[in-house]
Amino acid sequence: GVIAAGGLVPAYTSIVTVRGEILHNHGRDNLLEDGQLLLLDGGAESITGYATDVTRTWPVNGQFSPRQKAAYEAVLAAQHAAIDLCRPGVRYRDVHLAACLELARFLVDEGLVRGSPEDAVARGAHALFFPHGVGHLLGMDVHDLENFGDQAAYAPGRERSTQFGLGYLRLDRDLEPGNVVTIEPGFYVVPAILADEGLTGPLRDILDLDRAAEWSGFCGIRIEDDIHVTEGDPENLTAAIPKTVADVEARVGAAMMPG
């Protein structure tokens, strides 16, 4: 409706789901229930052919629970850390790792992971709850240049990591002025990942699966914006879309008011 009202077309099939832990869940036949989080990943194609790619997550009832709020603010902090590094000459892998470190701090604070956040990231423990890369190039394709494979997305001499999570990073080049990238960290509780002994076994000394079980049914949160790399500070092209806890609750709450 919003896209059509602007005379535009969708840049890709939108993801609208209460099962945010399923990363590309296009099924939309669920009934919204009190206490759930709704994740919307969508974007429009501009009249010049360029794509946008934005994600917001909000509480169906208009109010984050304490646990939802803590996780949401951790994802937002991770996004802020990553966005701040979107500057010329910065390696995109380092942008990703900055987001990972912020999320790892949350995991340690919540008792999901023991030890230091730095060790958690080095060993890939954070990826059990953030199993994808922090973003990708954005252009006339949503995942720009991806059809050309790693020879376009990775700088010469750089190869994909074999570590779970980091290996899904779509881009590993040094950022340049004029680049537009997405920054989209998330926090997900994925039963299949936490039940995979091949992933959790090597981390059993720092991973608290009993604590993780207490988060069962949480589903997922993702926050995504489109960032223009300039000669100076990063420019958030989608900053007008509310994303702070206060703004999200106010906007959703207002939409729920009768009349």
Language-model features: locations:
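Active-site neighborhoods and metal-handling regions in enzymes and metal-associated proteins
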Residues: 1-259
